[in-house]
């Protein structure tokens, strides 16, 4: 039943079409030439689509419009269009065979395609890192900053703990510049003033060595990272890795006492008798002279 309806719809559509699609058209053909060729079939208008081609060379820019090798011819009614297709399809025009057919207008499918994946949402809400309620982050401090200077800076808010550290940052993400080190600090405060108000007040009014500083609420993840690094450094300093055990040196070879050797030589000179060996071990013996 569905196929019958579709066929009837297609048949009704083709009977109302008055435009003919012409392909394999010579590139040298003009709209005037093609209109004269179709004049006997009642063609009211002819259109040859072109594209604009721009080149750097000036000598090729005299006619930048290039035809696509196709054309559309408009007729007064469907009967004339079908007559032109029947008589002229396959005929030669300017040494090229033409191909004609009814031009069916394109219609988009109204039913959505369920197989097509939906594009991912680009504007996703970024998660904001959690900030601490009692710790601030001081950025781009002098390299030789001291604990006392930072305490004096936050003296109105009772500073408790201060961690001074250095980290590598990149100024530009698109160009791979070498990173540079910055000195920063995490300062834990004991105050009833909201941490945001403290940051605004210190950043606007306080200066460090004549320069303003950047103060923001510290991220909880950064505080945990710095504390873990400090803990690891203290552990390594307290329990250094054991040194490699050195191999024992070989025992020295036994040496014959000088007194025993001299005594044997004296006896040999007196009695002309070879002296007995010093011991039963492999000690070297001295012959009589």
Swiss-Prot record:
Protein name in the entry: Regulator of rDNA transcription protein 5
Organism per entry: Saccharomyces cerevisiae (strain ATCC 204508 / S288c) (Baker's yeast)
Gene designation per UniProt: RRT5
InterPro entries (UniProt xref): Nucleotide-bd_a/b_plait_sf, RBD_domain_sf, RRM_dom, Rrt5_RRM1, Rrt5_RRM2, RRT5_SRSF_SR
GO molecular function terms attached to this record: mRNA binding
Skewed-composition ranges (Pro residues): 239-255
Residues in RRM domain copies: 18-105
Polar residues bias: start-end ranges: 279-289
Stated family: Belongs to the RRT5 family.
Region of interest called Disordered, as start-end residue ranges on this chain: 235-289
Additional comment: Present with 51100 molecules/cell in log phase SD medium.
SMART domains (alphabetical): RRM
Cellular component terms per the entry's GO annotation: cytoplasm; nucleus; prospore membrane; ribonucleoprotein complex
Free-text function comment from the UniProt entry: May be involved in the modulation of rDNA transcription.
Gene3D superfamilies in the record: 3.30.70.330
Keywords: RNA-binding, Transcription, Transcription regulation
């Amino acid at each position: 039943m569905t196929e019958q309806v579709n066929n009837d719809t297609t048949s009704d559509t083709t009977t109302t079409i008055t435009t003919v699609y012409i392909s394999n058209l010579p590139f040298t053909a003009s709209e005037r030439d093609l209109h004269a060729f179709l004049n006997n079939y009642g063609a009211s208008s002819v259109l040859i689509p072109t594209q604009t081609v721009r080149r750097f060379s000036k000598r090729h820019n005299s006619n930048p419009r290039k035809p696509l090798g196709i054309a559309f011819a408009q007729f007064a009614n469907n009967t004339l269009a079908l007559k032109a297709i029947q008589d002229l399809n396959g005929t030669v025009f300017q040494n090229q065979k033409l191909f004609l057919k009814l031009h069916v207008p394109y219609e988009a499918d109204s039913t959505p395609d369920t197989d097509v994946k939906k594009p991912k949402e680009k504007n996703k809400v970024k998660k904001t890192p959690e900030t601490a309620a009692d710790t601030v982050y001081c950025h781009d401090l002098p390299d030789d900053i001291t604990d006392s200077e930072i305490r004096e800076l936050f003296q109105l808010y009772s500073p408790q703990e201060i961690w001074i550290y250095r980290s590598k940052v990149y100024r530009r993400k698109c160009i791979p510049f070498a990173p540079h080190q910055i000195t920063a600090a995490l300062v834990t405060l004991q105050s009833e003033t909201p941490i945001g108000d403290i940051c605004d007040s210190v950043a606007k009014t306080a200066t460090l060595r004549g320069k303003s500083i950047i103060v923001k609420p510290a991220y909880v993840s950064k505080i945990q990272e710095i504390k873990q690094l400090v803990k690891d450094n203290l552990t390594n300093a307290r329990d250094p890795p054991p040194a490699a055990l050195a191999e024992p040196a070989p025992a020295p070879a036994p040496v014959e006492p000088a007194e025993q050797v001299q005594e044997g030589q004296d006896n040999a000179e007196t009695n002309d008798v070879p002296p007995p060996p010093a011991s039963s071990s492999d000690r070297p013996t001295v012959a009589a002279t």
